């Protein structure tokens, strides 16, 4: 059975509002990560992929809450003839100030090539408890030499 290693480049664009009600803004986070990948391969481009990984992020705006954060994402997708339209998952951003923000996402694309999707910020901890927002993400897959893992520039 062929092992497929999916590597993700995510560029996150969003608008969001903060729990204090006084601040809102946009973010554009990028970084690098590693993902543990599980694959059930049925052949001819048909397979299911699940992943769990972490990434370190920076934002082009240094005062963004997502600048110098990390994220853990767990998700999955089903490929049919090499394409997917059902990617779903959830991420937890661990922020520099010790708080966390959670988002869920959906996506579509082509296995081994990349994809696009949308996300919704659903909640946070502490001062970000009521944070909300939506955004767009895109990625380009890269190759990894570690079996069962993928690496990414997010």
Name every feature range the model reports, one short phrase each.
Residues 1-5:
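Positively charged n-region of N-terminal signal peptides that target proteins for export
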Residues 14-16:
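N-terminal signal peptide c-region/cleavage motif recognized by signal peptidases
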Residues 20-154:
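Beta-strand-enriched cores of mature, soluble protein domains
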